[in-house]
Amino acid sequence: NRSINAAERKADWWLFGGIYRPVWLEVLPQVHMEHFVLNADHHGKLQTAVDMAGDAKGHEIIVSVRSLKDGKTVYTSNGQTTITHPINNSDKEQMISGEWASIIPWSTENPNLYVAKLELKNPEGKIVQTRETRIGFRTVEFFPQDGVYLNGTKLVVKGINRHSFSVDGGRTTSAALSRMDALLIKEMNMNAVRSHYPPDEHFLDMCDSLGLVYMDELAGWQNGYDSKVGAKLVKEMIERDVNHPCIILWNNGNEGGWNTQTDPLFAQYDRLQKRHMVHPWADFNDLDTHHYPTYLTGVARFTNGYKVFMPTEFMHAMYDQGGGAGLRDFWDRWCTNPLFAGGFIWVYCDEAPKRSDKGGILDSDKSNAPDGVVGPRREKEGSYYAIRAQ
């Protein structure tokens, strides 16, 4: 498919072969929960949409919530430990709503997590399937000419872009590396991350656990997927990531790499929360995300514009000449305007794999990829400390 070649293989400095994400097969009963979407708000209300496979009439779905920290059961507002939803029809989608008492909301300062458990009971009273996922009770909202809100409080993202990259594995990463990266980003006093494609899910798990908000993006740089491929990949991305509390925004491609025909699919698949979707480096959907604005360009966008301003790339850190250099001047001035919603520095780490075919050198593809605020093995550069001090 030419659009895949354009959107992916021409969209990065490094291309690797093979399978570098987990792949598995799952055996399921004939009637089962195929997919479920959650919306847990900061007041304790939990909406659940469950897509059933097979005729589930006569089955029951049982929902319970426990604390991830100590495993204690969370009670509903009427003192019950579970919510039972009898399936009285053959509809594919089953909607379940309830309210849970005394929850602690998820936030960047206090990323409190719970585990939601869904059990499917057949007409004979036997549990035939159990699904669990971690959740955070939080509310994400976007208001035009205002900004992004988390739990009713305006959020200014102090963000950085991150490639999924390791010296020895290329695009193959590990949970340990994801944890290291998330901790280093938190140590820079940052609260947000963006990437050019859906990351390994264990990185989203770390963002959930450590309190980093995330911009989840469909791949595509300057060239987008065609509608057939794009629709499939939007569906797969959102269905995989939709229940992560860290995700606050969706991105459709990068710097022209979007297909507007797939834009409506984001709200369709994020059916309960309908989080805001943007086009990086564009005035789109009430959000100005233009990249690499100069100091005065940024000021002019506030003075003459009316859209929320959130550059999804700025302060390019090539050879550490950007990143923290001049950040205080930019940040302090831009923060004086209520339209400023924060931004994302380019980029987190140098992408330099160890080349076994070149004597073991770390190859950053000349000047294309040594653009991180940390080195390829996560060595702290000058910008790391400057950003941390901001």
Regions found by a protein language model. Give the residues of each.
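Substrate-binding/catalytic cleft of secreted carbohydrate-active enzymes
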Residues: 176, 182-187, 191-382
